[in-house]
């Protein structure tokens, strides 16, 4: 594991987090973490986020039972975005869909 300094300052104290299924690579969701959510995620190996709409820490699965267990964490070249692969229990999306990315805008086929 490499010790990198994540840049929480660039985007107002939050990092975008792209979450993928660790087995398939499917993108499940995009959310945000503040430093507290990031530390809790590292410590517990379960996903914590910062809810921008509720302005509070959010432990994924506490309400729905659809927990996310961390399998790997990567950062981009600027250390201001995270890519986290998880074991997803149930649906990742609040709509009940496995992935939040199900609305197709363009597909040439």
UniProtKB/Swiss-Prot annotation:
Compartments, as annotated in UniProt: Cytoplasm
Domain of life: Bacteria
EC number of this enzyme: 3.5.4.19
Range of residues in the leader sequence: none
Matches recorded under Pfam families: PRA-CH
Names of required cofactors: Mg(2+); Zn(2+)
GO biological process: L-histidine biosynthetic process
Any one GO molecular-function label of the UniProt entry: phosphoribosyl-AMP cyclohydrolase activity
Keywords for this protein: Amino-acid biosynthesis, Cytoplasm, Histidine biosynthesis, Hydrolase, Magnesium, Metal-binding, Zinc
Cofactor binding comment, as recorded: Binds 1 Mg(2+) ion per subunit.
Known catalytic reactions: 1-(5-phospho-beta-D-ribosyl)-5'-AMP + H2O = 1-(5-phospho-beta-D-ribosyl)-5-[(5-phospho-beta-D-ribosylamino)methylideneamino]imidazole-4-carboxamide
Pathway the protein contributes to: Amino-acid biosynthesis; L-histidine biosynthesis; L-histidine from 5-phospho-alpha-D-ribose 1-diphosphate: step 3/9
Sites where the protein binds Mg(2+): 76, 78, 80
GO CC annotation terms, alphabetical: cytoplasm
Gene3D superfamilies hit by this protein: Phosphoribosyl-AMP cyclohydrolase
Binding site for Zn(2+): 77, 93, 100
Role according to the record: Catalyzes the hydrolysis of the adenine ring of phosphoribosyl-AMP.
Family of the protein in this entry: Belongs to the PRA-CH family.
Subunit structure as annotated in this protein's UniProt entry: Homodimer.
Protein name according to UniProt: Phosphoribosyl-AMP cyclohydrolase
Lineage of the organism: Bacteria, Bacillati, Bacillota, Bacilli, Lactobacillales
């Amino acid at each position: 594991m490499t010790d990198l300094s994540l840049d929480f300052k660039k985007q107002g104290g939050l990092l975008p987090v792209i979450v993928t299924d660790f087995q398939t690579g499917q993108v499940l969701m995009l959310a945000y973490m503040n430093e507290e959510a990031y530390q809790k995620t590292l410590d517990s190996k379960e996903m914590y986020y910062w809810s921008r709409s509720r302005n509070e820490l959010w432990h994924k699965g506490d309400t729905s039972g659809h927990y996310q267990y961390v399998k790997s964490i990567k950062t981009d070249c600027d250390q201001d975005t995270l890519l986290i692969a998880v074991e997803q229990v149930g649906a990742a999306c609040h709509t009940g869909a496995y992935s939040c990315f199900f609305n197709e805008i363009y597909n040439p086929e």
